[in-house]
Amino acid sequence: PTVSGKYADVIENNVCKNIGFGKPSVNDTNALTSGVGCAAIFAGMGTSLPNTIVKNNVVQNCVETGIEGPYELVYHNTVKNTGENSVARYTGSTEAIYIKLTTEFEQKYIGNTIETRGLRCFSSYSNRDDEYKGIYILNNSVNLENTDASITCNYTRSDIEINCKKIKKIVIENNAGMMKDKKSVNIYTDKGYVMDYFSIHNPCMIGSVPEKARYCFNINNN
């Protein structure tokens, strides 16, 4: 994997455990509101960020998100047991990895190992009118763990969900462990928007996909 530009900040070789562990009251199964919780590795949105690499980190036991930010490369990280409290109380934002979109560079998520009790393994959302560069999700191992059947979840669980108005390119390929019995991948863009390039090639069940793309490759559903 490579990054663009002449320099990059690197977040690497960290171990983050037991992040933001607040215990719910006895018999409290009410969902937390979206955004209540924390992230183990976090960078806020901003155009002043350098092109950052996040690699070889371990995140284990986190209330909400393991890795969150507008990073250029997230590579070879292990993220386990995120959404830890969501086995009892789901929030609207319990992802193992949350992708904050940027218009400055394409974002690559490669070779990560994910196990989460949360809603999604990878997720991204923006309601801005910006046209984002692109997302690559490649060669990751994912496991959206089962939860207690007695707990009601009012949100859609999926391995990957990307929801934004405009993005030039999405490539989701060669990821292992994705769901085959439920909608594993859901991509939402503006109606009528034409992407440059779109590809999904995994053994998984595909849900929503963009309406139009100049070039579509390997859209499989098995």
Question: What would you call each of these model-derived segments?
Answer:
Residues K166-V209:
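Ankyrin-repeat and related helical/solenoid repeat scaffolds used for protein-protein interactions
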Residues N13-N14, N57, N77, N112, ...:
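Consensus "Asn ladder" position of solenoid repeat domains
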